[in-house]
Amino acid sequence: MTQHSHVAGGIVLNSRGEVLVTNQGGRSWSLPKGHIDDGESAREAAAREIWEETGVNELVFVRDLGSYDRYRTALDGGDDEGELKTITMFLFTTSQMELGPIDSEMHPEARWVARGEVAALLTHRKDKEFFEQVVPVLPA
């Protein structure tokens, strides 16, 4: 039986227009996101997850980017159909360039990536599709 969870995250742009991506457990690359805690709004969860996974906490909210559904990433990079996630995403900007994941065991690396290289780096196809869909609304 498939478990359904609600997740929130963000596309974070720095002053050079680069996008923040994070390594998940040393095996996959993703936009920063994670589960919404009890009593937390999706936007609050997104900001918390960005901080935990990358160390970036100086965020300026720009806009809601909508949501999409996807299965959890399996160890082989495919779909783990045991968990279906509804992922709500937000756009943030930051002037903070230094990265330092707080949860370094689960997220050993975060990096700034040129916008044109992000989709190729993301592991899950649904993350790639979502990113490619929202690129036109991202500020230059």
Protein language model regions, located:
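Active-site segment of metal-dependent pyrophosphate-handling enzymes
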Residues: 55-98
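Conserved N-terminal beta-strand and adjoining loop/helix that marks the start
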Residues: 1-19
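A short beta-loop-beta micro-motif enriched in histidine and acidic residues
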Residues: 7, 83-85, 105-107
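A residue-level structural signature of the nucleotidyltransferase/glycosyltransferase Rossmann-like core
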Residues: 3, 28, 110-111
